[in-house]
Amino acid sequence: MKWKIARARTTKITRATTAARHDLEHYCRDLNSWPRSWMGLEKDLPPGEQLLALFRPFLENLATSDLSPKTIQKHVDNMWALGGEFIRDLHSDSSLRKKPVELVLRQMIEYGGPLLYHGREDQQRSFDSTCRKFHGFLTKTARGRSRSPTNSPDQAGF
């Protein structure tokens, strides 16, 4: 029996140069209309617009990431679903309207996402993954905002 010598196959394609990078508009062409698409009543529009302001930096970060276009699109779709579920929760619990949108959102996605209204198990897993990723992004960027030169331990004046 002849033994083949295992050797690594090399490719002449440089993946870094062939991977097309897209901007946010490529993945969500109608991003500015998301709040209207989530809206059930006119009073849903302001929280929807606040959500979009929270979503946009995360979506821009995704669009410029090294993730595959298919994965990025899946995350974008899940973020749109998160907005819809958020507005649905506002309808089912009117006391949430009195709280800041960011606080309600953080509580909603702290351990994954809310249950999807008409979602299959695989969709729920994907949705939860996106929500955890978004929660991590919010936490990381909040830490970055809270650090200012005057809050540095070196300059605290102890």
Language model segments and positions:
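Charge-rich, intrinsically disordered N-terminal extensions
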Residues: 1-158
